[in-house]
Amino acid sequence: MAAITASMVAELRAKTDAPMMECKKALTEADGDLAKAEELLRVKLGNKASKAASRVTAEGVVASFVGGNAGALVELNCETDFVAKNDDFLAFSKTVAELVATQNPADVAALSALPLDGSTVDAVRLALIGKIGENVSIRRFVRFETANKIATYLHGARIGVIVEYTGAEEQVGKDVAMHIAAMKPVALSAADVPAELIDTERRVAEQKAAESGKPAEIVAKMVDGSVQKYLKEVSLLNQTFVKNDKQTIEQMLKAADAAVQKFALFVVGEGIEKRQDDFAAEVAAQVAAAKQQ
């Protein structure tokens, strides 16, 4: 059997970007034949990508891009916070955000089919899965195209905001975007709050008010008061400005002769159920897998 040297491992790693131990295993299996080892490794990485692509992705980043009269916000997911900080993953997320803004894909499927690096976005995504060993998915995106101004704000790459606004001061757009990230409104105004959210809040308020034992007319007023308070708390224009608790967002905008047309807020992993593994079960699974090898 041919001796596997460190330089051989380094050369194979440079060609494939595979982990060092994987390169050494492939070279050993190929009896030192670099070309054969590369082929074996590509097969293994393909299998690895296939397996990883079925796993839950609840971590990740939000990326943004603004250019010309268009802006985009994109959420990409991975499995661990460690990979969410990986340079290749971050670079891919920024590229995807730029593609959304400049190419205007209709949906994630159309985005995935766009050309990238001599291939497609999806092919690059699958190659990234093989390289880092975790599932990577493009979850969602939003794109604004307007003659108005666009502001974005990222908080630790886990919360992202994009705002369309009018007004002379760019700081206003930045302030509103930062406020949205902090206070997480669900709608621009009270009239825009989805009916299902209001219905849910009303049911909760009715149950609480009914427990008070007060007369029906008092209960009705209590419910209405609770709903109105909720609408004030979740609608952007009615919220108290985080940088000045003496003003609402609406008052701040009016003072600056500005207005917000729309916004979008992404929070990484929002609504995705994380897989919670039992440690003992995980060890048992690894032992069982080792016995089968």
Curated annotation (Swiss-Prot):
Residues 80-83 are annotated as: Involved in Mg(2+) ion dislocation from EF-Tu. GO terms for molecular function: translation elongation factor activity. One of its GO terms (cellular component) is cytoplasm. Coiled coil: none annotated. Transmembrane segments: none annotated. CDD domains: UBA_EF-Ts. Keywords: Cytoplasm, Elongation factor, Protein biosynthesis. Pfam families: EF_TS. It is found in: Cytoplasm. Gene3D superfamilies: 1.10.286.20, DNA helicase RuvA subunit, C-terminal domain, Elongation factor Ts, dimerisation domain. Disulfide bonds: none annotated. InterPro entries: EF-Ts_dimer_sf, Transl_elong_EFTs/EF1B, Transl_elong_EFTs/EF1B_dimer, Transl_elong_Ts_CS, UBA-like_sf. Associates with the EF-Tu.GDP complex and induces the exchange of GDP to GTP. It remains bound to the aminoacyl-tRNA.EF-Tu.GTP complex up to the GTP hydrolysis stage on the ribosome. NCBIfam families: tsf. Belongs to the EF-Ts family. This is Elongation factor Ts.
